[in-house]
Amino acid sequence: MKITVYCGATPGNDPSFMKEAHALGAWMAREGHVLVWDTGLMGAVSDGVLDAGGNAIGVIPHFLQETEAPCPLNYNGRLVKEIVDDMPTRRNRMLELGEAFIALPGGMGTLDEISEAIALAKFDMLKRPLIVMNVHGCYDALLQAFADMVVQGFMTSEVLERVSVATSAAEVAALLS
């Protein structure tokens, strides 16, 4: 399965974010899943995948190649890099490739990406697993906002039920197994 992972462009200030990202990558490799990723905290996911002998597809806009490019090595062909024109093209390509979607801790870009995936699920345009990885409660407020949207009539409970929540790589593994 190709798993698209969204997360912060920086590692954040809690070391457990990097630890869980790496653990997620290692699990993906052990199970034969392919990582679809970009940069930032996702580098820890790709390290986990590639260190464990797995495969990854790095999708990055050309303007970020210098500052946030995926690893320059190709790991004997196990790392495929796709250079795209811009961020919307990157986002669309990652949606196209992914057979499951995981949001690790991140900022506005991560929120944008997982929100788009949820919006597509609302219209049945995306019928693949959506997982929010709520490491150390980093998404508690977001998950509460989603629940509030249901109460206030801006989201249906059926859409919210399409989003699974995990707190660790082990829980993600259980959800996708």
Segments the model singles out, each with a brief description of its role:
Residues 1-97, 135-177:
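A cross-family phosphate/adenosyl-ligand binding-site feature
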Residues 104, 118-143, 157-159:
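Short, acidic/small-residue loops that bind anionic groups at enzyme active sites
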Residues 89-123, 131:
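Active-site/ligand-binding-proximal alpha/beta "capping" segment
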